[in-house]
């Protein structure tokens, strides 16, 4: 790493003290202008402190005059700065005010300075984590210890608090499909089949549905513990400092939402584990840590298969990773070939096979979350709508109805209005006029469209929002599935979880946007250094892209669980 940095420092310069002071003032200005934000302000303050530290450190070092690199650094920083303004646009309204425009300009320059200094520090100053000098000859012991303790913690939680597992409305829909044999792909069919293997086994052996659900919960505990321990073992073998190993292990084992998710029957949990499995296996194949790679190849294939089958956007992740590997060079030919096979099999299983089985998807409305929100926002804002557009809107509902059900952070009410309308069938039969309607209204009301998009997606790229993270118990059902009555252990754990969510010091653990930007920074820095680790960031960035164009909820933590793990 030091050689790479030295190579980039051939032409360097030292910045003047006044310039550094101006940048520090701008960073503080950025923080001051968003102090009334509805996001996690502590996360913003933490980011600002990081920017101040990096600015001071950069002042003590000579930075290169690499024009191309600096342009890319400034472009990346501009995107960060602009996103912080857009995510808090309500603090700068009305936009016609000269004072607010001046505040926006200062805030933008502050974010630009903050981002630029952080990236410059990571590219040219940060020495990197030093690998441990002692020999690491016991990876098996590390894996076994990590695995055993995580399994023990999660099993205790399952047995004492959430037996036989946590089942929400979506989970109960999957259980209903398994019991009745009437399947759909609203929740991924192959995930439902995976749950069904354990549910049916439990019913076969005990005749009790509770044991069927419990068997799946136990499988998920073992699966996640294995994925987590595989990551910890890899860091151990690569010489990560002991404090880093303990911090990563504690993040997997002790953060409350990790424990709850281990027994929650959601597609997102297994999918996120597969994302971590694929990422770690890919890293080990790019940088072999053992002479025998057969196990890593097997886990790489299993992780890729899980991504393809357990959530619909997994196929896009594999496709983009395949393209990146193909463009990265011939030395990745074997990896690309394996991914290509995984992708083809996934496409067949999720396409023609489901069609032949007569299994239908979630419906058109589920793919229209953001377009529907944008049209509803125009109605909500009371903007003037052209007569031709008004007539087409009324085939679904009156503008007043759209305005009445619109919620800026959730598309379900608007989607429900669409499904109940007589115009829904017309939309499915002939979507082109409605597409043209959406485009015309966007050109006439760009501000309303932009606000609707920001409010619907900002939880995934802004500093973080207080929104539900975990579920508990079993959703009301007709199968007699009930949770175990509450006890003192469950009460204490629930209070700890709530306190953790409320404590500002813990907010970085719950900030999706913080993890998103950290992932983006890792991708950018590694790409600039021409290190293949940038590929490890792709799974989350592709998932993020899918959320930005179609999320139904503005800050659904489980949707972002892959980045929390990886």
Language-model segments: residues:
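Start-transfer (signal-anchor) and selected internal transmembrane alpha helices
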Residues: 2-26, 45-78, 99-155
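Short acidic/glycine- and proline-prone juxtamembrane loop motifs at membrane-interface regions
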Residues: 260-271, 310
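Transmembrane-helix motifs of polytopic, lipid-linked glycan transferases
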Residues: 218-239
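Extracytoplasmic catalytic/substrate-binding loops of multi-pass membrane glycan-assembly enzymes
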Residues: 162-174, 182-198, 202-211
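Membrane-interface alpha helices of multi-pass inner-membrane proteins
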Residues: 296-311, 321-323, 342-346
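Membrane-interface anchor segments at the N-terminal boundary of transmembrane helices
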Residues: 27-46, 211-215, 452-537
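Membrane-proximal stem/loop segments at transmembrane-domain junctions that anchor or position
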Residues: 359-485
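Specific aromatic-rich, kink-prone transmembrane helix
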Residues: 179, 230, 272-288, 304, ...
